Amino acid sequence: MKNTVVVYLEHQIEEMGVPDHIANALKPHLKIVSRNNSVSIRDVGKILSAVTLLSGDILQNGSYLQGWIDVLITLLVSKVIRPDLHDRFLSLSFTEDDLEDYFDATVQRRTYRIDDEYNAEFDHYTMSQFYSWLYLAKGGNFPDDEDGMKKFVGGLFSRWSGGPDDPQSIPRKVKRDWLELFKAQ
């Protein structure tokens, strides 16, 4: 069953004409973060207001890679519902516990198989968000990469097989290019 804020978000997205590439990232994001964080109808309004103020061509151009859009959505939403984490996302100074808490990314939700059995609690979006931010914080390095997570997550941020050149700069670039409303020329 959907919670009230997700239903409200979906209605407002439709009413406001939020572009699909933004809406399709915002809906699952709010769904997972509302499991473990307090999100009000007013918060949804603040988030959607921020969406309408995005700069650059992010609203018109749906060809950006999913990882970049997910970083944008995390920065937008965390600034409203978890301002204590927003700066840590931006500077990549969060802990794994912060990620688990914000995304409700329990081991069960981010692990496809447990003891060689399919895990019914696995949630692909939760796993993707958790490991994307871990990838950025670790500069694209996963020491124990038995599941090929580095290649999967790197593909969310770069069309090239090696991943992005400087993963740790991505949150700052997203802020600079899409979130900063007023830039000195």
What are these regions (language model features)?
Residues 13-185:
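The feature marks long, low-complexity, polar/acidic/proline-rich intrinsically disordered regions embedded
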